Amino acid sequence: MVVEFKNEPGYDFSVQENVDMFKKALKDVEKELGQDIPLVINGEKIFKDDKIKSINPADTSQVIANASKATKQDVEDAFKAADEAYKSWKTWSANDRAELMLRVSAIIRRRKAEIAAIMVYEAGKPWDEAVGDAAEGIDFIEYYARSMMDLAQGKPVLDREGEHNKYFYKSIGTGVTIPPWNFPFAIMAGTTLAPVVAGNTVLLKPAEDTPYIAYKLMEILEEAGLPKGVVNFVPGDPKEIGDYLVDHKDTHFVTFTGSRATGTRIYERSAVVQEGQNFLKRVIAEMGGKDAIVVDENIDTDMAAEAIVTSAFGFSGQKCSACSRAIVHKDVYDEVLEKSIKLTKELTLGNTVDNTYMGPVINKKQFDKIKNYIEIGKEEGKLEQGGGTDDSKGYFVEPTIISGLKSKDRIMQEEIFGPVVGFVKVNDFDEAIEVANDTDYGLTGAVITNNREHWIKAVNEFDVGNLYLNRGCTSAVVGYHPFGGFKMSGTDAKTGSPDYLLHFLEQKVVSEMF
């Protein structure tokens, strides 16, 4: 009997034993860095001369791994392997597939410190964030395994005299997973193995910045005994193989987490029926946000400031759920702003190997983009805190607060994906909700209020997929906070929800006459 689902815990780094353990994990991982990693197609490891170099964003002289780069022919071979593996994998019972996934999660649990340590180096994640990422990966796998067991027998439908009816679920086929670099293990593992436990096969194209951690999942899948070809590992240049993966006639579904521009491109291209394709593709896309914390009058300003600062600057603001807009009632605006500035000054920034609160941003492109937005912010509003940048060794951006903004300013409209939060002053709660909704995105939001009527208004009118009361707008927990957004934030395919696997299943009805 499978035990009841419970979330995987992190490590308490106030306990010296845990600190020492994780320092050892970091040292052990560092010894393994710089190696070449292969493609994995039909279980075969294929090393290529052309490679993607993964570097430590906190120390760009440190090479994390050299990932073999897949060509279109490699992708074609991977599709053939996945299609062939699907013939057998789809015949496994739901329980057998789920039990294999539970074995995968057990292996990850034993290697949790190693997995987290890799993300400290490869993604520049702070210790707590890296451990949380690894733990969330376990949660996704465990949750989806149990979800598949729940769906195994289908759902009851009505019978009538002389007729027995069955309603059940079947897998779709081969699909493509394109995960992000900001949650390089949790989202990557969840969006890869959800369709797999549902009986499908997958081509996994990892983020260019974080291929090493994705390859570790491939090692774990092999150790767990996943049949060859069920998951095929094809890192590569998106300009070379991205469209090919999406357009392919055998791609039944695409799971994507990333930018709005790429997500809408995938959605558009997936709508085209290719020659030899006799089905319609499904797209599961999460495309970011412009998330706001609304602060009402007559509230605890300390709590409001803490919610804003932790939501804005955790993992250097590189979360699709990060707070990039603080919408504050005029009566508490100055106090909340002042307290937010004070808290921000206390944050530590540096190489996350040293357990700093904030680390680097992921790469030079993002660094330059964020730096440019800070300059825009200086023109549109007032720079209150931070604004400094340094790419002499890594890609470091100070936590930045810009005040005096208007709703239509670029800082308040465009996704920055870095440690920058803009403050706007509003006259009342109605205006606050109006400003909160004045964006193309609708992922997360939070409301700090003691007014129940205002909270009810926010529940009904604040147009986001995940809304929180009197807390920050980040840190959704699998099983508690199914995650996904509205509008241009994506398809609202709630990850970590009882419905998520339905995106990778077809419903079949069988009616038998007696």
From Swiss-Prot:
The active site is at 286, 320. Its EC number is 1.2.1.88. The keyword Transmembrane does not apply. GO terms for molecular function: 1-pyrroline-5-carboxylate dehydrogenase activity. It comes from the Bacteria. GO terms for biological process: glutamate biosynthetic process; proline catabolic process to glutamate. This is 1-pyrroline-5-carboxylate dehydrogenase. It comes from Staphylococcus aureus (strain MW2). The gene is rocA.
